[in-house]
From Swiss-Prot:
It is found in: Cytoplasm. InterPro entries: Alpha/beta_knot_MTases, RlmH-like, tRNA_m1G_MTases_N. GO terms for molecular function: rRNA (pseudouridine-N3-)-methyltransferase activity. Its EC number is 2.1.1.177. GO terms for cellular component: cytoplasm. Pfam families: SPOUT_MTase. Its main location: cytoplasm. This is Ribosomal RNA large subunit methyltransferase H.
Length: 150
């Protein structure tokens, strides 16, 4: 069975958490899904120090031997069909999707990771978490020829 772990800096507010849980339940029919919410060092004034601290937590949370996908503005943009093919090509393997903090991550620690971007636009952090899990759900719907994706 495919294993997917979402590693995200920060936590969801209750209004986003219920939607996240709804998608997670649906995704759970197709894969083993887990989430690691990591501490955001919002009190840290030095952005580089903040990114280093958060990046260390991310690195510690990675699943061993998993395909690491960093969500980054510098990443490649793909559509939902291509995203579903990415998951299909790695069926029965492990993925770790990384959502860094509001200031990003120290990308030099993720040179071997695949980098994806959803857009050049900026999204609220909590909304992006929902967008990611929805795209994971959509990918499985595409792979199962569901009418969900039109």
């Amino acid at each position: 069975m495919t294993k997917i772990k979402i590693v995200a800096v920060g936590s969801l507010s209750p209004k986003f958490k219920s939607l996240d849980e709804e998608y997670a339940k649906q995704v759970g029919h197709f894969c083993s899904l887990s989430l690691s919410e990591l501490k955001e060092f919002s009190e840290e004034k030095n952005i580089e120090v903040k990114k280093e601290k958060e990046t260390k937590l991310i690195l510690d949370a990675l699943m061993p031997n998993s395909k690491v996908i960093l969500l980054s503005l510098k990443g490649k943009q793909i559509d939902s069909i291509a995203f579903s093919k990415l998951i299909e090509m790695n069926t029965n393997q492990s993925f770790t999707f990384i959502i860094g903090g509001s200031d990003g991550v120290c990308e030099e620690h993720f040179e071997s990771a695949q980098k994806l971007s959803f857009s050049q636009m900026t999204f609220p952090h909590q909304l992006f978490r929902i967008m990611l899990i929805e795209q994971i759900y959509r990918a499985f719907m595409i792979l199962n020829n569901s009418k969900y994706h039109k």
